[in-house]
Design a protein with these regions (language model features):
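Secretory/organelle targeting and membrane-embedding segments
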Residues: 1-173
Length: 174
């Protein structure tokens, strides 16, 4: 909600809550839902070099359980600012990394100052806000490599709270 909300009229809890509610009320689901959502359940396999059980083989889980352990959905936010911009939410158990982050992926510019061949292997520009672990912000973008050659490479600028401050911060959801 914080990413999609408009700027509050004042920096108070009530004003922020009001703007968050506005954006949450503007959320639309894909229609039909199956076209923009996926869900699943992890099965046995390998994780970090170790053999792991599937969800149905876990202790206290019925062998015929249909409980999802992964879900992803593409949402819309019907506001002037966000109309036509997809928001993706993904959550799951036993994924390769335990991470909570917000990734804002920018559209490619219609006109780039570099030729297409110089940039075709570049990733998208991104702003990644890491909530946990390793709280911080990363800005990923393409940058020209110094020198006379026309070469552009993906680079990242990182800010880590733990490296910048000695004071301890509360847990992400405290």
């Amino acid at each position: 909600a914080l990413v999609g909300m408009e700027e509050p009229v004042e920096f108070t809890a009530d004003a922020i809550r009001t703007e968050k509610l506005k954006v949450l009320r503007a959320i639309t689901l894909p229609d039909p839902l199956a076209d923009g959502a996926v869900r699943g359940q992890y099965t046995q396999g390998w994780l970090a070099g170790e053999r792991v059980a599937g969800y149905r083989q876990e202790k206290d889980v019925p062998p015929d359980s249909r409980t999802e352990t992964y879900a992803a959905v593409r949402l819309g936010v019907e506001t002037r600012r966000w109309a036509g911009v997809p928001f993706y939410l993904r959550a799951g158990k036993r994924l390769p990394r335990r991470v909570t982050e917000i990734s804002i992926i920018f559209k490619k510019a219609p006109h780039l100052p570099f030729s297409k061949t110089d940039t075709e292997e570049l990733g998208s520009n991104q702003l990644v806000i890491r909530v946990q672990p390793d709280e911080g912000v990363t800005l990923k973008f393409g940058s020209k490599v110094p020198g006379s050659q026309m070469e552009v490479r993906d680079v990242a600028m990182d800010f880590l709270y733990g490296e910048s401050f000695t004071e301890s911060s509360p847990e992400a959801y405290e």
